[in-house]
Amino acid sequence: MNPEVRAAKVGDDEALLRAHQQVWKRKHILRYYYETWYKLIDEALLPGTIVEIASGIGNFSSRADRRKIIATDILCGQNVAVVTDAHYLPFSPGSISNFVMIDALHHMAKPMQVLARAAECLKPGGRFVMLESYMSPWASLVFKFHHEKSDYSYDIYNPLNHMPQIWYGNAAMSRLVFDRPERLPLIVESIKYLEFLSYPLCGGFTYRSLLPAPLLRSLHKLEVSPLFANRFLGLRMLAIMTKL
């Protein structure tokens, strides 16, 4: 485990966020992966207002080469502009051009409510760009060694019996939400599947890298091939949704 994360007090969410910020500053290979994903998100965004939902430590919104982003989160943070619950976004109907959400859907108690509220706030033709873990057949094996478990019994409409657990994440959430796109309040334009093996080997925010950074980068370049980047082997998904 990364020493910064080990030192964070269990149950202290603000301490864990600070630990993640320290890991981000120190761990070059972690920034490499996220910058790769940020570029894909950038390419999908439309001109106009950009709001990030559940921004965490705010790495996406703090990039200097980006248009201004309104970062929101349920906790205060260095780059957080609006402190709010994602289920009750405080924006006027039809006022936002883009919503972005990165690695947060699996923490949402009522993900359909979050999407419905975002749809209300989007302008016609506006986009919701989401990067999220994806429980492919391969991922179901990888996540057996991950601290966030998958629960396919979770009721995305009435989760009250699961409320204490959802804060720690449900890796199956993207499947529960996107496997039936006809239920979504937005139109799914595209889903791109990402990653295979190199990112887990880098350890993410929580664990130490298992391989040297140059080797991880080389492996990652191979993983962009459709041989690995597909719904059977992908570990992540980039979903682009639009409001009609």
Describe each region flagged by the PLM.
Residues D103-A104:
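Short catalytic micro-motifs in class I SAM-dependent methyltransferases
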Residues L186-L244:
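A C-terminal cap/extension of S-adenosyl-L-methionine-dependent methyltransferases
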Residues M1-H87, G234-M237:
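Conserved N-terminal segment of class I S-adenosyl-L-methionine
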Residues V100:
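A conserved beta-strand element that flanks and buttresses the S-adenosyl-L-methionine
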Residues Y88-P93:
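Short conserved loop adjoining the S-adenosyl-L-methionine
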Residues I166-I191:
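Short alpha-helix
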Residues M112-R127:
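A short glycine-rich, Lys/Arg-flanked "PGG" loop and its adjoining helix->strand segment in the class I
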Residues F128-P159:
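Conserved class I S-adenosyl-L-methionine
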